[in-house]
Amino acid sequence: MSIGTIVQCIGAVVDIQFPRDAMPKVYDALVLQDSGEASFAEKGLSFEVQQQLGDGVVRTIALGSSDGLRRGMPVSNTGAPISVPVGHGTLGRIMDVLGRPIDEAGPIAADEKRAIHQKAPKFDELSPSVDLLETGIKVIDLVCPFAKGGKVGLFGGAGVGKTVNMMELINNIAKQHSGLSVFAGVGERTREGNDFYHEMKDSNVLDKVAMVFGQMNEPPGNRLRVALTGLTMAERFRDEGRDILFFVDNIYRYTLAGTEVSALLGRMPSAVGYQPTLAEEMGKLQERITSTKTGSITSIQAVYVPADDLTDPSPATTFLHLDSTVVLSRDIAALGIYPAVDPLDSTSRQLDPQIVGTEHYEVARRVQQTLQRYKELRDIIAILGMDELSPEDKLAVGRARKIQRFLSQPFHVAEVFTGSPGKYVPLKETIRGFKMLVDGECDHLPEQAFYMVGSIDEAFEKAKKLQ
């Protein structure tokens, strides 16, 4: 084990000099030694080697606060990448980027440790999946169904409901699924992590979830690596032959941490100031989130969209890797329709008659056609009013407005602030309800009857009460 000394410290980037014949490899973990003198530097602070500068000097990223560091402090080389505990000992626990417990519930009883940098599975080990994963959320099950073992992205700007949608999916899938889940909180609010922990605890599914957090108050090194820590734990369960759910909130913060690190390392920025290695970093993470012949990882990722611009390099790079994209729209949220999913922008590879069946496919496409027609007529209505439309168009607008309201749904996780109990709608009920709407069987019902209900039967009951 070689010992080096700190020669330069700029924010989270620390240069450390080692003997020339004992230079650490890229991605090796280094640990700050106790020099015996008074300093408020974090004890046992870890560093990850990013670059070899020559003459025995390596450039590293501190995985923790670099406050209190100074030149000349001794640092030892562990000779291996960062390794984190994996296996059943991690379930029900909250850990940081290095796999250390932060829930004050004692040490983690894991027999095995695994390096966070792993190769993606080989091509011949991959297993394509066409099984559908029912979420109980009407708009998602209808227009952008999820695949078991697939990758899903929840795209949205600030405050349109990504985290609430993520929580509802965890509530509906993790509880129904009864399998194991891993949650990686990447650069999000600590309060949300706390809410998530208590939500899981109250639902009695805490013993099936491993939680890893690198929140927004942490240095960029932690936020950059915490997604890999969570993924390493999920991969271990997958390699056991299990079906795993892997939740990431938020992938954009992973990119942002990469941007901060890249700038500190002195790389030339590319478009919009992002790191030049954006596509490679995203690919390294996403290619590992995959299903093999032994087990599957179904991944649900929240993706923040800066300034609601889906063409921004970060969300645009994420799009490439996903099977389903759920786009949350500010315009729909402004109408008070929650979940604010845009049924025209959201897509899924699974929406194929050979996978979902002809009936589901046709109903989904007819719903989208009706909504698209309404979108086209909106300008005419705004200028000339409804009276100028042809009878067919009036009918289409009436149906579209009912469909729009029927796409709303009360959530279990939002019961506290909506006051209405959450609804889980099975896929068959969802298809039946929308089929009746597009077939004109509900033309006589008022629009309000469809707002914030579960199944179509509830809409009929609500209509009776409104009369």
Curated annotation (Swiss-Prot):
Enzyme class label: translocase
Cross-referenced PROSITE patterns: ATPASE_ALPHA_BETA (PS00152)
A GO CC term assigned to this protein in UniProt: plasma membrane
Domain of life: Bacteria
Catalytic activity: ATP + H2O + 4 H(+)(in) = ADP + phosphate + 5 H(+)(out)
Binding, ATP: 156-163
Subcellular location: Cell inner membrane
Annotated EC: 7.1.2.2
Record keywords: ATP synthesis, ATP-binding, Cell inner membrane, Cell membrane, CF(1), Hydrogen ion transport, Ion transport, Membrane, Nucleotide-binding, Translocase, Transport
Pfam families: ATP-synt_ab (PF00006), ATP-synt_ab_N (PF02874), ATP-synt_VA_C (PF22919)
Predominant location category: membrane
Molecular function in Gene Ontology: ATP binding; ATP hydrolysis activity; proton-transporting ATP synthase activity, rotational mechanism
Membrane topology designation: Peripheral membrane protein
Assembly with partners or alone: F-type ATPases have 2 components, CF(1) - the catalytic core - and CF(0) - the membrane proton channel. CF(1) has five subunits: alpha(3), beta(3), gamma(1), delta(1), epsilon(1). CF(0) has three main subunits: a(1), b(2) and c(9-12). The alpha and beta chains form an alternating ring which encloses part of the gamma chain. CF(1) is attached to CF(0) by a central stalk formed by the gamma and epsilon chains, while a peripheral stalk is formed by the delta and b chains.
Stated family: Belongs to the ATPase alpha/beta chains family.
Function: Produces ATP from ADP in the presence of a proton gradient across the membrane. The catalytic sites are hosted primarily by the beta subunits.
Protein's recorded name: ATP synthase subunit beta
Source species of the chain: Ralstonia nicotianae (strain ATCC BAA-1114 / GMI1000)
Lineage: Bacteria, Pseudomonadati, Pseudomonadota, Betaproteobacteria, Burkholderiales
Gene: atpD
